[in-house]
C-alpha cells in the first residue's frame, strides 16, 4: 500500500460519496454519467482529490476518491454539485422536464471514509496500546 504525503504528514484517505438526483428522478444514462464524471475530475484537481472509481444508477452516482487531509470536503462537494447541476441542465435540456425546480441534486449527500484496516482491528490495536 503506497501512502500519500505532503510537507507535514503521511496519509491515505479514501472517501465514498453518494449523490442523489433531486426527487430520485430517473435521469442518468451513460452519456450524462460520463459528462458528470469528467466535471468531477476537472474540478477535483483544484482540491487535491483523485478519482478512483465512478459508477451510476438512473437516480444516483457512487464516487470513490482519494483526498488530502486539508481538503475541505463540504466546500468541494457543494462546488461540484453546483457546477455540475448548472452544466448538466444546460447540456442535457431533457433533464428539466423531469425535475420540478432548478436543483439537479438532492440537498443532502452521503460521504463515508473507507479503506485501511477494518474498524474492529483498529479498535483492538488502540485498546492494546497501554499493554505494551
Protein language model annotation of sequence segments:
Residues 1-132:
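Basic nucleic-acid-binding interfaces
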Amino acid at each position: 500500500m503506497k501512502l500519500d504525503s505532503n510537507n507535514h504528514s503521511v496519509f491515505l484517505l479514501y472517501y465514498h460519496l453518494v449523490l442523489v438526483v433531486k426527487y430520485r428522478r430517473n435521469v442518468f444514462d451513460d452519456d450524462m454519467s460520463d459528462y458528470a464524471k469528467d466535471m468531477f475530475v476537472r474540478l477535483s484537481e483544484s482540491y487535491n482529490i483523485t478519482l478512483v472509481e465512478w459508477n451510476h444508477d438512473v437516480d444516483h452516482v457512487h464516487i470513490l476518491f482519494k483526498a488530502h487531509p486539508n481538503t475541505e470536503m463540504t466546500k468541494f462537494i457543494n462546488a461540484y454539485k453546483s457546477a455540475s447541476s448548472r452544466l448538466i441542465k444546460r447540456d442535457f435540456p431533457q433533464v428539466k422536464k423531469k425535475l420540478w425546480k432548478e436543483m439537479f441534486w438532492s440537498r443532502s449527500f452521503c460521504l463515508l471514509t473507507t479503506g485501511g484496516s477494518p474498524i474492529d482491528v483498529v479498535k483492538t490495536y488502540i485498546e492494546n496500546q497501554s499493554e505494551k
